[in-house]
Amino acid sequence: MALDDIHTPVLLERCLELLAPALQGEGAVLVDATLGMAGHSEAFLDALPGLRLVGLDRDPDALAIAGERLARFGDRVHLVHTVYDGIGRALDGLGIGEVQGVFFDLGVSSLQLDRVERGFSYSQDAPLDMRMDGTAGLTAAQVVAEYDELELRRIFYDYGEEKLAPRYASRIVQAREVEPITTSARLVEIIQQATPAAVQRAGHPAKRVFQALRIEVNQELSVLARAMPAAIDRLAVGGRVVVESYQSLEDRIVKRELRVRSTSTAPVGLPVELPEHRPELKLLVRGAELADQHEIAQNPRAASVRLRAAERARRRHA
């Protein structure tokens, strides 16, 4: 199967349009903090011959595929196995200080969803794993087995925004006392049995629970909350950050960080805005951009995307 059949980059042309003005110089550095199968990055490297890429990913399988895909670019590309809140350490390890661009394409990748054995999908039976890095960390099966009822309720509420969180947490605890819950099919069965018929008609009842477990297993929101400021701190003046998120919890973190950094810190009533009070960032899009119907028809994954972008206007202490 061709890579493009597995993963079509979301809003590719718009992302390139937003990043390109900051990446024109020879030797400009772009960090793709969520490299995946490198669909976006391959296009960026083709379009910008002087560009150097630092690609980060926690998934060794994705890094291997990306490495093959980008091999033709030679020493213009450096790949690092790390979670994206490790951006500072990754750049330090390469001897790179400031960068001209940072790109995030958040959420679970097509590769992870399509490989049944990874356990991300509620529509196919597989071991309950859900780790983006299959070499480290708790699995979803361990979370389901070891968290108490209140902890399960919390993650279903907080990370899945699931109204039936108490019911699902209770049923899971009851079921695991009979036998371990180790597969996605068994977890789906428990959730379906606990779901009122009227709710089942509104969509798959396991969707939010699986999202919550995935976020907990991979600590996605806490990682993002650390990664956003770390990435912005490495941007050179004139550098740009572009972020694609796919659910409201991620987008809320991105929106908050960009809003804070793009707001003047001048005290209310100060007659003159001093240079140190000027915003660090200038927003490049109004609110969050969504995909149009043409893009969604070509690439259904784009249906839930929210794109935000900003440019570094000044250094934090200048």
Curated annotation (Swiss-Prot):
InterPro entries: RsmH, SAM-dep_MeTrfase_MraW_recog, SAM-dependent_MTases_sf. Pfam families: Methyltransf_5. It catalyses: cytidine(1402) in 16S rRNA + S-adenosyl-L-methionine = N(4)-methylcytidine(1402) in 16S rRNA + S-adenosyl-L-homocysteine + H(+). S-adenosyl-L-methionine binds at A38, G39, H40, D57, L91, D105, Q112. Its main location: cytoplasm. GO terms for molecular function: rRNA (cytosine-N4-)-methyltransferase activity. Keywords: Cytoplasm, Methyltransferase, rRNA processing, S-adenosyl-L-methionine, Transferase. This is Ribosomal RNA small subunit methyltransferase H. It comes from Clavibacter sepedonicus (Clavibacter michiganensis subsp. sepedonicus). The lineage of its organism: Bacteria, Bacillati, Actinomycetota, Actinomycetes, Micrococcales. The gene is rsmH.
